[in-house]
Amino acid sequence: MQITREKWSKNFSEWFDWVLREGEFYDYGRYPVKGMGVWMPYGFKLRQNIISIIRNLLDSTGHEEVLFPLLIPEDLLSRESTHIKGFEEEVFWVTKGGSEDLDVKLALRPTSEVAITTMENLWLKSYKQLPKKYYQIVSVFRYETKATRPMIRLREITTFKEAHTVHETYDDAQRQVEEAIEIYKKIFNNLTIPYVLSERPEWDRFAGALHTYAFDTIMPDGKVMQIGTVHHLGQNFSRALDFKIQKKDGSLDYPHQTSYGISDRAIASVIAIHGDDHGPILPPSVAPIKVVVVPIPAKNEEGTQQVMKYSIEICEMLNKNNITCVTDQDTEKTPGEKFYIWEIKGVPIRLEIGPRELASSTVFIKRRDNLKSYTVKKEEVVNKVKEVLNEIQEDLRKRAWESLKSRIEYANDIEKAKNILENNSGIVEVPWCGSKECGLKIEELTNARVLGYPIEDRKVNDKCVICKMNAKTVLRVAKTY
């Protein structure tokens, strides 16, 4: 087996569909509602492992988990006018209860800022109760009219982590935004997902937000995908819902809020970013199975049974040391067929055990990521597997970051930017004066989408690619999902 990435990069959409189906992650396109898929047991375990990382980081930073109803009354959803305007074309509506028309239409939640603020208004009365940080991991529904894609563009987003926080002052809320960004950096670091962090321009902020900060990553085909957002909401939602708290000086005022979300797209990135033509390469931090043992049959039945017994023993040693391991005991498939199955599931390490390993009390270790192999003694296998899993985690992270950085280019000419995007994709940074007019023109002329600008100060000794005035920063542009 050689490492090739032809299908993975040039036919990514087909590759991704094939992996989800054959790897038994996610069954998409066969459930009889467009834009909704089914998590299969193996994929669901990957999802659980990723959620566990997210949940642990939120819990450890003072966030409290809640669970809100799925339905939101129309009159409530419309209280924040900018917000509903941003979502009105995407809302699923419940209009009947049984055979009776409902007096008030009910929305399947597209997001929960309004619903959660409504209850915070009842729960929180004083600055002494702040800051307050809630989160939930739920399904949200968006009536996508564009072509839907498994995990990437869905009508039911099944893994929507949304956090909502309340603060006394604008500055307190801004500090929470900074904390949220750091939490997301840790999440994506654990998932070995590289990213670009940008502030979205004013015309592309979350509906009702003062500021939106977004994490974007580059997929194998060069298109960019948003994987997480953080919003400073200011007093927009508290004001719209007449939510006030008593401040330290005794006066009443609207509190400041933030919200931040991660969705199924983070899981899609984990599956996609480290792949090759044989399937995904899952980071050990979240792989449902970290090690698979494939017994190699002997020439006779007795020898084969002894190999199987030894294989099971090795696997049990690993499981006792908290290394998730399975032994492939299928007697009808050849070793080659088994290799194919476990490669498409992205299992980081394969152990091959045959008569030779049995006779010498050794184990043959094969890495999924770079195909390196090792033969170790039985008593060394646990420590060696731990060492190799750590190496795989770091190597995947390093390679992904190197790949992302290599696909970010600078262009001080609009035609050059357009050519890069048409031929290489990735992200192009162009000098920008900061005006909306020039930003929209950049989008139009490149036939791409503006991602935003760096949140850190970026000195640019160049002219805006549109108006030729001095540039204030760079604007990031990309082909996106």
Swiss-Prot record:
Pfam annotation, one family: tRNA-synt_2b
Catalytic activities: tRNA(Pro) + L-proline + ATP = L-prolyl-tRNA(Pro) + AMP + diphosphate
Enzyme class: ligase
Main location: cytoplasm
UniProt-listed Enzyme Commission number(s): 6.1.1.15
GO cellular component: aminoacyl-tRNA synthetase multienzyme complex; cytoplasm
Compartments where located: Cytoplasm
Keyword field: Aminoacyl-tRNA synthetase, ATP-binding, Cytoplasm, Ligase, Nucleotide-binding, Protein biosynthesis
GO molecular function, one term: ATP binding
A single GO BP: prolyl-tRNA aminoacylation
Signal sequence bounds: none
Subunit and interaction comment: Homodimer.
Family: Belongs to the class-II aminoacyl-tRNA synthetase family. ProS type 3 subfamily.
Free-text comment about domains: Consists of three domains: the N-terminal catalytic domain, the anticodon-binding domain and the C-terminal extension.
Function, in words: Catalyzes the attachment of proline to tRNA(Pro) in a two-step reaction: proline is first activated by ATP to form Pro-AMP and then transferred to the acceptor end of tRNA(Pro).
The protein, known as: Proline--tRNA ligase
Species in which this protein is naturally found: Saccharolobus islandicus (strain M.16.4 / Kamchatka #3)
Gene transcribed to yield this protein: proS
